[in-house]
Amino acid sequence: MRRLVLGGAAALLACAGLPAGATAAPAAPAAATATAPATPAVDWQAAGLAQARQLDLASARTGQRYRIFLSVPDTAPPPAGHPVIYVLDGNAAFPSAALMARTVARRSKVTGLHAPVVVGIGYASAEDYDEPARARDYTPPAAGKAGAGKGGADLFLDFIEQELKPLIQASTPIDTQRQALFGHSYGGLFTLHALFTRPAAFQTYVAASPSIWFAERHVLSEVPGLAAARQHQPRLLLTVGELEQAAAPPSAKAGERGAVLAQKRMVDEARDLAVRLEARKQALGLERVRVIELPRENHGSALFPALSRGLEFFLE
């Protein structure tokens, strides 16, 4: 590449490969430098979800602080009040659940379905998931098998029943005979624990990808508790991702991850529990039991289709 140097000094000309006395050829006009348009001053604001509110609530029962998210339909409540669904892991799951409920509200004149109030139960944290807090609150006592930092499910259920529900019912008209609980993973385990130990707390239970394996499958020993309150006739939906027991090719990797998936038996445990409960449905006082396997979903991705299926099941 030729470099033409303007200035005429012999030394510079020599350095440029021109003989002394030679005249450098005129340089081509410099290309115009593109000037970026001035960036207007902007003031980004935190995005908010329409028709949603939140507050931080300290619990006397658990001694913990929770972030409560609330979305109320803009449609008039039925005479008995709005149905309501309580959604665990509220920081992560509430936005999707609230948008799904708003879709129901927009189509209510066509479908005849009443959109529910959505209550997200989260934590006063900037994270989507507060792992230590959910491990504490969502796991049952399990007769000493729960481990350190776990086993607080009964106190957390007390918080929902004794502190949170009265607050929600004071905020908007609620149909106390149309209440649902949704939980995923440890939250799904908590949902089963609530069903088996306090079946009158909700009318619909949605256990998504429940961690039945926890504490040597302790939650299965709680099933007989249903029979003590069979007059309440609760409904149960179990969901699980197809890929929760074995990773999908070509991403599957042999070794530790595959062994953990196989050991937890997420898909088999959900299926087996559904079969067991269906066989004893009348004796246990269950109105309905259903299990849905979500195609090509893993443990994390199964949350969102489970929310959709759970909302549909609740409103049927």
Name each model feature, range by range.
Residues 1-13:
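N-terminal export leaders
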Residues 6-7, 17, 138-140:
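General helical structural elements
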Residues 18-33:
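Signal peptide processing junction and immediate N-terminal pro/mature segment
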Residues 11-12, 21, 25, 67:
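Intrinsically disordered, low-complexity, compositionally biased regions/tails
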Residues 14-15, 24, 97, 248:
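Residue-level recognition of conserved structural "scaffold" positions that shape functional pockets
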